[in-house]
């Protein structure tokens, strides 16, 4: 499979210089006179597969966008194996610039033809890194000064970040062969070289969001009292210093101190800073919303109410999100282990040779965690504990670190896989450690509104019923009733189930390279929590939250997650 019509490939002809005259071949233009063998590497992205969904395949692929498939340079290492098939320090290849790739175009596809001169024919292991990091370039260009070959040094190397993933920058996506590549170089015919195909994959992963409802607005029905405030509106108040603020959740009431004239009550926070306003005929700017004036002192009042059947048709608009536990490091080449976490290997496929898990540089340490009430800043950025403690109510403030605006249109990918929320790195722990404190998850913030989507302001929950005023709470449940406060009508939904292969006995809640994890919220059964409250050692406490996943790999392996709250 070509990535976006580009053959991510390089025809690397290795002219093996012979030691005897018997190996001399006809000398054509630009051909070496003495060769042991010629090798052509055809390097491309993995082709599509019709296999059933598993830890390597998902049933769906996506070509990605242009910047995710561009090749600017490469490191190719060929390590000559000894008679026992072991790596040696006899290596060829190295760092190749764009110019050194000798770019050509054939049938609309880009092909690269770099040349190498090798000393011997025989068996070689091949490691291909497209768009390598500076540290990998340094290894490739260095003199051999350690006990390990360049092949081993690069394959065992890792990349670490604090959030700005440079190996996922446009035109700089690092890609590495997924399988161990061995080739027996035999041909000494320049026109008919030994050919070996190499599949490469991106080292990073991607989390996307598909918009299921226009403007991310979801209808739902909530339980409430048998009466409800008859009218709620929004408007503007102008402070004495001319600062204008928008007030939501202004409830219409009778002013009992002034012949039952209309007054609008704003609950404030927890009902402790209630204020009363008078609606004027003036409107604010181009909004069409009325300007309100403050009424002091605060009057005795009685809400206008209407009878209900104990239910209200409301909406939840998802407006913010925060990804949690984004891994800060990844190996350059695939690292894998079996179910026991005792036998490790570099390069290969899950499900082959008893390989059960991918491995990231922090996997072993995460597997040893017993105290989950930590931020784990050495493993993650956007660590769950830090996001959990964040003050989200002012998420639009410049000081807000974790929460971002949830997209309302697919503007950076496509309709199938949605809008990219983030590129990320592998995050893998053994099955029994796949708990919220250690797996990658997501928190959504919702804005509660009436059936039209208009915010209802601060609301209250008591005995699984929802109220728009504290008076209604106490009238229905007694003066001493305890309740949850949804400040400004905000609620929160959390899921730790960004799954790789849902229900798998190993790679269930995991992030794996070259996969797109597509999140789609299909609906709600209830309003989320008033605050972000997550048990780091257990599952979500919201029993109305459901998550489903299907998946697929290369060019990007797409794994769909349908979420119902």
Task: Give, region by region, the residue ranges found by the protein language model.
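Bacterial Sec-type N-terminal signal peptides, specifically the leucine/valine-rich hydrophobic h-region
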Residues: 13-16
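Sec-type signal peptide cleavage vicinity
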Residues: 2-6, 18-565
């Amino acid at each position: 499979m070509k990535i976006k019509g580009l053959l991510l490939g390089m025809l690397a002809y290795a002219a093996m210089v012979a030691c005897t005259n018997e190996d001399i071949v006809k000398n054509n233009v630009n051909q070496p006179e003495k060769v042991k063998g010629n090798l052509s590497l055809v390097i491309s992205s993995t082709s599509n597969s019709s296999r059933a969904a598993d830890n390597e395949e998902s049933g769906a692929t996506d070509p990605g966008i242009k910047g995710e498939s561009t090749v600017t340079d490469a490191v190719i290492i060929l390590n000559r194996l000894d008679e026992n098939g072991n790596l040696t320090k006899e290596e060829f290849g190295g760092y190749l610039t764009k110019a050194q790739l000798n770019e050509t175009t054939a049938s609309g596809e880009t092909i690269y033809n770099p040349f190498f001169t090798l000393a011997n024919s025989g068996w070689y292991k091949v490691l291909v890194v497209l768009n390598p990091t500076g540290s990998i370039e340094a290894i490739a260009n260095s003199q051999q000064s350690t006990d390990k070959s360049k092949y081993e040094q690069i394959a065992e190397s890792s990349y670490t970040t604090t959030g700005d993933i440079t190996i996922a920058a446009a035109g700089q996506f690092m890609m590495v062969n997924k399988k161990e590549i061995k080739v027996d170089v035999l041909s000494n015919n320049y026109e008919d070289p030994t050919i070996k195909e190499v599949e490469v994959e991106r080292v990073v992963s991607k989390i996307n969001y598909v918009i299921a409802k226009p403007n991310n607005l979801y209808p739902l029905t909530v339980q409430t009292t048998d009466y409800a405030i008859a009218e709620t509106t929004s408007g503007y108040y102008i402070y004495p210093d001319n600062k204008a603020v928008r007030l939501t959740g202004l409830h219409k009431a009778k002013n009992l101190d002034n012949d039952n004239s209309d007054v609008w009550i704003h609950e404030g926070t927890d009902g402790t800073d209630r204020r009363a306003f008078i609606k004027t005929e003036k409107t604010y700017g181009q909004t069409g919303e009325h300007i309100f004036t403050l009424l002091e002192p605060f009057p005795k009042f009685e809400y206008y109410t209407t009878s209900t059947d104990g239910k209200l048709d409301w909406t939840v608009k998802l407006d913010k999100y925060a990804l949690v536990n984004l891994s800060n490091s990844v190996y350059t080449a695939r690292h894998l282990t079996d179910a026991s976490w005792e036998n490790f290997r570099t390069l290969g496929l899950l499900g082959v040779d008893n390989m059960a898990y991918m491995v990231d540089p922090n996997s072993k340490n995460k597997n040893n965690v017993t105290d989950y009430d930590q931020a784990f800043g050495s493993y993650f950025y956007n660590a769950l504990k830090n996001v959990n403690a964040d003050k989200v109510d002012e998420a639009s403030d410049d000081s807000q670190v974790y929460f971002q605006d949830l997209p309302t249109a697919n503007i950076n990918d496509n309709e199938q896989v949605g809008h990219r929320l983030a590129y990320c790195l592998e995050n893998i722990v053994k099955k029994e450690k796949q708990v919220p404190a250690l797996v990658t998850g997501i928190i959504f913030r919702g804005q509660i509104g009436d059936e039209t989507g208009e915010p209802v302001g601060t609301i209250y929950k008591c005995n699984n019923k929802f109220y728009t005023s504290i008076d209604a709470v106490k009238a229905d449940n007694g003066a001493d009733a305890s309740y949850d406060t949804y400040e400004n009508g905000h609620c929160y939904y959390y899921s730790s189930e960004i799954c790789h292969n849902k229900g798998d006995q190993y790679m269930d809640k995991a992030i794996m390279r070259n996969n797109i994890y597509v999140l789609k919220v299909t609906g709600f059964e209830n309003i989320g929590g008033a605050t972000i409250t997550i048990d780091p050692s257990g599952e979500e406490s919201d029993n109305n939250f459901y998550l489903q996943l299907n998946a697929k790999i290369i060019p990007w392996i797409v794994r769909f997650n349908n979420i119902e709250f």
